[in-house]
Amino acid sequence: MERIHELDSLTFSDMLRQGSVSLSKDKNAINDLNVFPIPDGDTGDNMLMTLKAGCATMKDHLGTLSEMAQAASSGMLLGARGNSGVILSRIFAGLAKGLQGLIIADTNAFAKAMDAAVTEAYKAVPVPVEGTIITVLREGAAGADASGDLNHYLETLLEAMQVSLDHTPELLQVLKDAGVVDSGGAGLLSIFRGMNDALNGNITAEEIESTVTLSTPTVELNKFDENSTLEFGYCTEFLLRLMRSKVDVDTFDETEIFDYLNRVGDSVVAFREGTIVKVHVHTFKPGEILNYCQQFGEFLTLKIENMTLQHHQTVNQNNASFKVPPKKYGVVTVASGEGLVNAFHEIGADEVIAGGQTMNPSTQDFIEAFGRINAQHILVFPNNKNIKMAADQAAELYKNADIHVLPSTTIGEGYYGIGSIDRDNPDAEEVIASVTEIMQSVVTGMVSTAIRDAEGDQVSVHTGDYVGYSGKQLLSDSPNRKEAASALVKRLDAASRDVMLVFFGEGVPQDEAEQLVAELTETYKNLEIMLNNGTQPVYDYIFVLC
């Protein structure tokens, strides 16, 4: 086997792609490293989709090691899903920073880049918790030996990561109680195992498919003929590489482009990542925008769609009138299930991103949702702790409105929070403070199917049973779904509340839900109960008490 002393761009690309292959094989086992007996955010899936987004950005990209690392980082930044995916994207952002300006990297240079990855990963977490992915990264980098070739460095890195991963239950009691190691750390170890395989020449032929590439839409050409009128303009998207032959890349102020786009277009989403400017804009004259932007660089990708032609195939918000004054507040939230989505729209949400407990939206999903809202302030309700980091990352990248990510961790908090927004109050901070206070008074309980045995507060949970819980508290368990639901409502102290919303899920017959509500109404005579068909996955019932 050839020993590698210097890392070039092609080898780095192979390493990341093989890391994706390795993680793809291990993702189900990683998903099963779940400390909670309810289907969770699927760490393996989130990390894999994030890594694939980076691999997709690198595809067919020829450049230096530095440029390749930056391309991967940019793709992961936008494709990041779930907390584990966001942290992974920041790890590779740090690695890219450490490799910045390098055509090749020897062992010492790569080791320093790994140290930069550690620093960036810890910055991504407001309150770092040891015993997680960041610990495995830090202790792995600290234990790796950079005195030899890259093969030796990766081998010792993997050894140190494995030791660290095995030790995570000693750092987090919740892992020890569940008898598992940290899932994010396991995912990271799998990625670096694949990277090590590639470095040693063990590259599989498995195709790495992108999870972020958009499919080509079906176009009904008869919807726009020779007698039609262009009502909605063109949806124009492109990636522009700033070129040193045209501008001083290091000092160029991208707001020159952003200000121009806001003058001539609508629904602008534009941001810069390194030397790449990503643009989404609605305009009647895409040619003028392309000509203007080309004076600063060259296009990497380009897509123009006739929105009048797409009128019958796209959502209503893409057809909004141009050049209308922005409203004060816009709202973005996250939910799954047609009934829940409709409920959020009815209560005042402008955009409901498809997602939730086991389907975490990406940073890109949030950015695109922001771009479809014409508002000064956009309030974001993630409704899940595992979604908030992607929302926060999107908020940092988006520059065309003030984005406020609120601390909603449940469907109930998001629902009541959105419904309480005082849209006539000009003071955004007052509005946010009021909404946050109201959300804190909301209690949300869910019923789902247990995927493992567990011990909770006064309840033993058995695999396959229906389990009622609130936050991370296990409150009821029964083989009978209705019994588990009734016991949960009692544990939530429904008798002390005034109103309870009940959303029943996609697998629950309506007559069962109606019977449950009838029984609860008889038991809690002073409680106003409202039943809704949420059609949500994962949760058989969602109870929201206020």
Question: For each predicted feature, which ranges?
Answer:
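N-terminal loops that bind phosphate or other acidic moieties
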Residues: 1-546
